[in-house]
């Protein structure tokens, strides 16, 4: 049985990507807003407020989380490309998910993701040195390759949380 926390398996470690893998990851980021929108299409308010697994976030919280983390990853990208010494410190995910903003309409985060991913992909189109790195809050390096690969996985991972819930519930 698949662990409901990791429908695509555990998060892969950041690594260098081949040119083909990089193109696939960029394509995954371009596709994510539409795939996430399709995953929540037609869900009622009670369904949006259903946890994707016992003890997990609601579908609504997952959508907002993806937008929040991808906005943060875009800022990481900007910091690396502009020579910033350290990447932005991420928000505390559990505390952030518990704030009133997590109950906003999913459309707000879906619109943010659509525009953000268009812009982010345009920025990535000009990258020539994918080994440029920034420092993570723990002091380790994170290359643009690693950031891109993990962002693509992250979007697919959370979309799968929602689609698997829909399959289980017959929605």
Swiss-Prot record:
Spell out the residue ranges making up region: Disordered.
1-23
Determine if Thylakoid is one of this entry's keywords.
no
For this protein, the Enzyme Commission number is 3.-.-.-
Query: Its GO CC terms?
Result: cytoplasm
- Keyword Cell cycle assigned to the entry: answer is no
Disulphide bridges: none
Name the coenzymes or cofactors required.
Zn(2+)
Q: Where in the cell is it found?
A: Cytoplasm
**Which residues hold Zn(2+)?**
65, 154, 158
First-listed, main subcellular location of the protein, grouped into a coarse class: cytoplasm
GO molecular function terms noted in the UniProt entry: hydrolase activity; zinc ion binding
Stated family: Belongs to the metal hydrolase YfiT family.
User: What is this protein identified as?
Assistant: Putative metal-dependent hydrolase DR_1024
Supply the source organism for this entry: Deinococcus radiodurans (strain ATCC 13939 / DSM 20539 / JCM 16871 / CCUG 27074 / LMG 4051 / NBRC 15346 / NCIMB 9279 / VKM B-1422 / R1)
